Amino acid sequence: MPTEQDAELTLLKGHLLIEEILTAVIMNGVKRPKHLDFARMQFHQKMKLARAVFPGEDPDWIWVALKSLNDARNKLAHGLDQAATATAVKKLIDYVLNFDPISGEVLERGEEPPQPLNWILFSLYSYLIVYGDVVPPRRNQLLEHLSSLPATHD
């Protein structure tokens, strides 16, 4: 992620990374993902479909936060009003810090993390990966190969 000085780039890259995870959640959650045109889907459509197939817990805060992330990104991408973008980013940060269980355990109430935008993007990304089960455990290929060999008796 970019440094805190470039909040706009951080917002855009974070949005893209989270969109990739939403796509992975959808691909894991539907029987025939090849029939979906992910390239033409917008973030909010992926968000709704990912929520419909989400295998983990379904707390409202994560989906509200993702909508807020998309709103902030859209303000940045479609407008020249830096104040509106900054307000949307601040709203997103405040919301996630208030509801994210990781932030609640690590930070003191009212404490702001060192790079708040990076912090909350990491938090959203991590939540989706863990509870969305998008990184399935891979079996060790060597173990898989050895298991397929016929047993030998010495």
Task: Please give the residue ranges for each predicted region.
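Amphipathic alpha-helical interface elements
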Residues: 1-154
